[in-house]
């Protein structure tokens, strides 16, 4: 889990548009966040395995 202070800091409006960065909406993780889902790779994987994300399934080839 991300530090509460950093999550609150990321929610504040940035002074400049280049200072914004993505955080996972579920856990607050700042790295490897998918823009389409607003989730980090770990949360995305967990929700996909639970069937919470429609149309997403585990790939096998």
From Swiss-Prot:
Gene3D superfamilies the record matches: 30s Ribosomal Protein S14, Chain N (4.10.830.10)
SUPFAM superfamilies registered for this protein in UniProt: Glucocorticoid receptor-like (DNA-binding domain)
Co-factor(s): Zn(2+)
Free-text cofactor note: Binds 1 zinc ion per subunit.
Keyword rRNA-binding: yes
Function: Binds 16S rRNA, required for the assembly of 30S particles and may also be responsible for determining the conformation of the 16S rRNA at the A site.
Subunit composition and interactions: Part of the 30S ribosomal subunit. Contacts proteins S3 and S10.
Name of the protein in question: Small ribosomal subunit protein uS14B
Species: Pediococcus pentosaceus (strain ATCC 25745 / CCUG 21536 / LMG 10740 / 183-1w)
């Amino acid at each position: 889990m991300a530090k509460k202070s950093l999550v609150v800091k990321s929610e504040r409006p940035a002074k400049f548009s280049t200072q914004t960065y993505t955080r996972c909406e579920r856990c607050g993780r700042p790295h490897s966040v998918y823009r389409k889902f607003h989730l980090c790779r770990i949360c995305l994987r967990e929700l996909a395995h639970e069937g919470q994300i429609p149309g997403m399934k585990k790939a096998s080839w």
